């Protein structure tokens, strides 16, 4: 999916959480959005997913303007927030079945779903209500739903700090990379620069609601630019830090 974020701003009261963010994201890309707490990362994802409406600007998916009422467009994306929302009494199998209905997908391959749940250490928990699961188990359950649905746009808020165990993070990275190879667009937020540098095809840095960096990573890996990026993040977190 082609994603165009065109001068998007978002205001809460008197505070601008986002100020004129413009980005063009191509199909097949994994995009890491970095920034300190309060930089605007989650607000940007909320606007992209239709959870919040921009105060100004627009978001286009494949050239069509998006808003929360565009249900057909919303069926082409899926969003995993920092703490996935889940019906307390629902279990994992019911969640996957609900996702398939909402996204109008055919019945999945049972063996492939079972293998995925086994890799996520969720297979013994398929009948457990979400209210009894840990945060990491909830995030892995939501990840399983996204993998099975396979939307055109995958959006993750802080998957690397979601409480998932190392295997869960490994499955996230593997499935996100496989999705990108299928032409999906993957966007995730993080504060972990080292992983983002190695995993993302593009890195965007937000600070106080503004876009400070938009860098294609592929041709820059191993060129020494990594230190420049780390220095930039440190300066944004500590304005007194000198170059």
Where are these regions (language model features)?
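Conserved ABC ATPase "signature" region
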Residues: 97, 101, 108-125
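The feature captures the beta-strand-to-loop junction immediately N-terminal to the Walker
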Residues: 34-36
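A short, proline-enriched helix->beta-strand linker immediately N-terminal to the Walker B motif
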Residues: 148-152
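Helix-to-loop junction immediately C-terminal to a conserved catalytic motif
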Residues: 49
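Catalytic Walker B motif of ABC-type/P-loop ATPase nucleotide-binding domains
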Residues: 154-158
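Conserved ABC transporter NBD signature motif
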Residues: 57-68, 72-73
